[in-house]
């Protein structure tokens, strides 16, 4: 305890206020080697630099051309320096890349099919979660097929979606009419996606994104059981083709 007290008495901070800045200097009995720079000298230089900046800001208006000038020069032209930096010549490799990519069309910012699928996955307004699920599923499709997952998704929906549905209409007599009705693209995608989700829920994985990715891969390979539903709907529509009303 006495040793700690003596040590505390030997090393005491002495606060110095210089130009509004508090600097703590320690009085120690330990001598520093002459080769090492003094800490107090560095503090003094730092305070002098701060005072010079304060005098410069208070004496006149701040001008970047003057303050940013290199030593030995009173003023620098910032506009000329920025223009000189913008004159960059592309390399031969960059020019070759430009020629190769010049004819490639820029992809659209949004994909209507992806937005539609994301909205059908979304529950309780959690769109970011739906986008994450779809992204993971498409990544699994890419890992297993090594194809563009968006094109694979659009192709799978187009092949799986039915062209028409049958609707029952009351004719006013005892027998009702079953009439085939054509579907637009949005209706076809919705029906196909519902079949994909139903088939995906029958898989064993506990992660919905994994089940969805496996089902999309099966559809891309043509081995999904959802094609049976499409064929059954088409058979029913063909059987009732006599009731189609042409305008």
Curated annotation (Swiss-Prot):
InterPro entries: Ribosomal_uS7, Ribosomal_uS7_CS, Ribosomal_uS7_dom, Ribosomal_uS7_dom_sf, Ribosomal_uS7m_fungi. Residues 1-26 form a transit peptide. SUPFAM superfamilies: Ribosomal protein S7. One of its GO terms (biological process) is mitochondrial translation. Its main location: mitochondrion. It comes from the Eukaryota. The keyword Nucleotidyltransferase does not apply. Pfam families: Ribosomal_S7. It is found in: Mitochondrion. Keywords: Mitochondrion, Ribonucleoprotein, Ribosomal protein, Transit peptide. Belongs to the universal ribosomal protein uS7 family. Component of the mitochondrial small ribosomal subunit (mt-SSU). Mature yeast 74S mitochondrial ribosomes consist of a small (37S) and a large (54S) subunit. The 37S small subunit contains a 15S ribosomal RNA (15S mt-rRNA) and 34 different proteins. The 54S large subunit contains a 21S rRNA (21S mt-rRNA) and 46 different proteins. PANTHER family: RIBOSOMAL PROTEIN S7 (PTHR11205). This is Small ribosomal subunit protein uS7m.
